[in-house]
Design a protein with these regions (language model features):
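C-terminal substrate-binding/catalytic lobe of Rossmann-fold NAD(P)-dependent oxidoreductases
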Residues: 1-90
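NAD(P)-dependent Rossmann-like dehydrogenase/reductase catalytic/cofactor-binding core
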Residues: 74-128
């Protein structure tokens, strides 16, 4: 991240290990360098991911859940701003057997061979 930003970046990353057969939930924390509003960060998320077929930025106060991405190539993301600690809390959920493995491989193959990025990957998640 620091290389991409051209400056040092410090992020705490916490993968949550729970007794389930598929899915990864992650929380990452970073210090803010200035005061920002929810709307400013949401606009940045939306701009960053607007053309990403498999990234879903969730609505305000909705935390990603692994059951929402189970059996799919989607990653659900969201964030909260903690004004007490001047940190942003970023959350994400993937199905590690699809997005984290086979689905990611198919997505990369599609891009490498000039196929539509979403080819073979638009199955609907298993929930609800």
């Amino acid at each position: 991240l620091g290389y991409a930003c051209g400056q040092e970046v410090v992020i705490n990353f916490t993968p949550h290990l729970v007794p389930m057969y598929r899915g990864i939930l992650v929380t990452a924390y970073a210090s803010l360098t200035k005061d920002v509003t929810y709307e400013e960060v949401k606009a940045a998320y939306d701009a960053c991911y607007e053309n990403e077929a498999f990234v879903r930025v969730l609505d305000k106060d909705v935390c990603p859940q692994t059951k929402w991405v189970e059996g799919s190539n989607y990653v659900d993301v969201n964030f909260k701003i903690d004004p007490r600690t001047h940190r942003i809390i970023m959350m994400g959920a993937i199905d590690n057997l699809v997005k984290g493995a086979a689905g990611q491989a198919v997505q990369n193959m599609n891009l490498m061979f000039g196929f539509k990025e979403t080819e073979g990957l638009l199955q609907v998640p298993m929930y609800p």
